[in-house]
Amino acid sequence: IDLLIQTMKRQSAVSMNTIAGRDFYEGNLNGTPVVVVQCGVGMVNAALCAQVLITSFSADVVINTGIAGSLDPNINIGDVVLSTDSVNHIMDVQNLGYEPGQTPGIEVAAYPASETLRNTAKSAALKLDLTAHEGRVASGDRFVREEKEKERIKTVFGASCCEMEGAAIAQTCYLSAVPYLI
């Protein structure tokens, strides 16, 4: 995040607004207006920042970067995973007739990511000689370290990786009809 902010400052004037305890930096990257924020750890922080970006800054897309744990033996440390969709691996109300990961009142369990954003990110990764994978991102407010839990997330959700914010951003963007990419 600091590198993005430094790059913005070299290219344009940057203003900073603090909302809900988070610093939102407005500026330009390569001529494109952007807002950069570090949401912090967890689903609530992520959803909060996504909603502020959408309502206070009129974001027309939301892109999240961060660290995830691989659930696929073909994804290595340093590789990039571009979301095809995102799912909350903690949400479980199957006893009420919902799919694993599905939030009551929402018709889908997995929130589709923007194919346009994914293709743009894939092209950028290739130019930077990064190994990029496409797959489902599973999120939950828990650090997943036990092999049994990793296998459950991979088997039940078909996830490529897991982390702690993406599905909250995805759900917020889905409900607000804003394209996103994790």
Positions of predicted regions on the chain:
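A glycine- and small-aliphatic-rich helix-loop capping segment at beta-alpha/alpha-beta transitions
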Residues: 7-14, 55, 76-87
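Short glycine-/acidic-enriched loop or helix-start segments at secondary-structure transitions
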Residues: 3-5, 47, 72-74, 91-92, ...
